[in-house]
A protein has these predicted regions:
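Short alpha-helix of the ABC ATPase nucleotide-binding domain corresponding to the H-loop/switch region
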Residues: 160-165, 195
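Short, well-ordered strand-loop elements centered on a beta-strand within folded domains, enriched
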Residues: 1-9, 16, 112-114, 206-215
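Electropositive, glycine-dotted interaction segments
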Residues: 1-92, 101
Length: 241
């Protein structure tokens, strides 16, 4: 099965035309056991779940919707090296973040807080923005989960546009150790991605999904040679032409 076929199969529930950002590292292509379901994880982050807390006894592997993010963070924060790595990654995206901590309640529910440079008191997750929750979950997915093939649904959904370029850089960095597939409709992702990393997923009249790399098409190559960017072609809906 090719990478494109794997992407189509994993995203078969999606409807309509979508751009897929395939962020891959050449040295690991042959290492990915795409035929093993245990190596693949698909995430569609819902920030409402982590804000509400979770049962302390749940599994520490991050759920597809990141509902158990407090447990995943508790696991990471229990190790000094992992905690430092997490904080460095978080501060790189959110410079005002000074730390994360978890808090267990008497009813065995687990919450997490974030410390910010603006206040001495920790900020409960319930007060954090959806975008901040998403960023924390994305860092966990990219750097602390062990899946070798990761699909992430619209990770930019709650983020300010100014953060997308940095997010794409995080994806590229993390792709040294895992295959990352991002589904998106956002042209900003296309702007910061390499042309060869883009796969266009579309459906025909019968509902079948098809994948193609726009950068391989002669007409798109002509546009690119004339210094018309992939981002402009996507916004003008010319990648399928």
């Amino acid at each position: 099965m090719t990478v494109e076929e794997s992407v189509c199969e994993t995203l078969r529930e999606l409807k309509g035309t979508m751009t897929i950002l395939l962020i891959e590292h050449e040295s690991i292509r042959s290492m990915l056991p795409l035929n093993s379901l245990k190596s693949i994880a698909a995430y569609d982050i819902d920030p409402k779940g982590p804000k509400a807390g979770t049962f302390f006894g749940g599994k520490s592997e991050l759920e597809p919707d990141a509902n158990n993010l407090p447990i995943a963070l508790d696991r990471i924060l229990s190790d000094d090296q992992s905690r430092r790595k997490l904080l460095n990654l978080l501060k790189d995206v959110l410079p005002f973040a000074n730390g994360l901590e978890t808090e267990q309640m008497q009813d065995s529910s687990l919450f997490f807080n974030m410390r910010e440079e603006f206040s001495r008191k920790p900020m409960p997750a319930s007060f954090l923005s959806d975008g901040t929750i998403d960023l924390i979950a994305l860092i966990v997915i990219l750097y602390f989960e062990r899946k070798s093939f990761v699909v992430i649904e619209e990770p930019e959904r709650n983020l300010h546009p100014s953060l997308i370029s940095r997010l794409v850089e995080l994806f590229k960095d993390a792709s040294r150790l895992k295959q990352i597939v991002v589904s998106t409709h956002n042209p900003e992702f296309v702007r910061y991605a390499e042309p060869g990393q883009l796969i266009l997923i579309s459906r025909d009249a019968s509902g079948s999904s098809h994948a193609e790399r726009p950068a391989d098409k002669a007409q798109v190559q002509r546009f690119l040679s004339e210094e018309i960017s992939m981002h402009e072609l996507y916004v003008q809906n010319l990648l399928e032409a």
